[in-house]
Amino acid sequence: MTDLTLALDVMGGDYGPRVTVPATLQALHLYPSLHVVLVGNQPEIEHFLPKAESSIRQRIEILHTTEVVSMSDRPVHALRNRKQSSMRLAIELVRDGKAQACLSAGNTGALMAIAKVLLKTLPGIDRPALVSCLPAVNQKPVYLLDLGANVSCCSETLFQFAVMGSVLSEAVDKNEQPKVALLNVGIEEIKGNDQVQQAGQLLQQSPQINYVGFIEGNDLYSGNVDVIVCDGFVGNITLKTSEGIAKLLVNQLEKGLTKGFFVRLMAKLIAPRINSVLKQMNPDHYNGASLIGLRGIVVKSHGSADESAYLQAITLAVTEAQRRLPKMIEERLESILLDINN
């Protein structure tokens, strides 16, 4: 891995430096060529660094600021009035070429607003989209977008999301010709609102996208497709519902395995397999949503993420930076739009 720098808004999220700094130290151990800029309150950050090895400490820079975007800040307010916030300064490092990607667990709306203004969207992209992974029965990643950055979308925007999702699957998972579907209330061509139907027609006209049609909610986790596209209203509800069901299943499984002597004995015997299943079902295993469609890389972590989950988000940011995802999306989109116009 060539040297790369991540800018981390370590003050964002429910736990701030208590989680973000220890997780970053783990990432620095995993990636010897990784450098980080920790943006936030320096005394609070330093509190979690005394035990860091000198070789690790040399790859850490601290950019001090005491201003933070709160979870209650409206996006416009954060954009206009939080110009020295840890979130904004982290994004500015990407804009200025001092970091290849940034990560924040802070206010999603503010992150989108600030990132869009500072980094700008790629040519041919009207709006950035939030995208993340869903688990599937075949254990391969399935990308779902948009997850809430755009509550309502026209057909052209959905088409752009499909292109970006396809390129993401290719870049991150080395997936040739990823299968792309539109989330709908039925698989028949007559089903769905005008926006979804028109987006389907646009995708059918694009031979470079492996569009397979509509997909219903009960097929989300089948692994039959690689990219699922919808507007942010539907996507956010889908994601939160999925996370809620996963937590319920994990909780019920853990409770069931502690009832009775023989059940506990069997649970111990098959513990490795059970732990593997629980890990696959745990939403933390899929932490990290990418704000794609921008000229720079921005990754959003869950605000409630623990160290393990935050480390997953760092890993995602590193992967996208290594693959130069924005450049890949830009080149592919240009080729696809040229195909359609011809």
Curated annotation (Swiss-Prot):
Q: Look up the signal peptide feature and give its range.
A: none
Pathway the protein acts in: Lipid metabolism; phospholipid metabolism
Recorded catalytic activity of this chain's protein: a fatty acyl-[ACP] + phosphate = an acyl phosphate + holo-[ACP]
**Does Lipid biosynthesis count among this protein's keywords?**
yes
- Return one Gene Ontology term, BP aspect: phospholipid biosynthetic process
Keywords of this protein's UniProt record, alphabetized?
A: Cytoplasm, Lipid biosynthesis, Lipid metabolism, Phospholipid biosynthesis, Phospholipid metabolism, Transferase
Does the record carry Cytoplasm as a key word?
yes
Q: What is its EC number?
A: 2.3.1.274
Alphabetized InterPro entries for the sequence: FA_synthesis, Phospholipid_synth_PlsX-like
| One Gene Ontology CC term in the entry | cytoplasm
Q: Which GO terms describe its molecular function?
A: phosphate:acyl-[acyl carrier protein] acyltransferase activity
HAMAP family per record = PlsX
Protein function: Catalyzes the reversible formation of acyl-phosphate (acyl-PO(4)) from acyl-[acyl-carrier-protein] (acyl-ACP). This enzyme utilizes acyl-ACP as fatty acyl donor, but not acyl-CoA.
Subunit structure, interactors included: Homodimer. Probably interacts with PlsY.
The UniProt entry's sequence similarity note says: Belongs to the PlsX family.
Which NCBIfam families has this protein been placed in?
Answer: plsX
The protein's name in its UniProt record: Phosphate acyltransferase
Query: Which organism is the protein's source?
Result: Shewanella woodyi (strain ATCC 51908 / MS32)
Name of the gene encoding the protein in the UniProt record: plsX
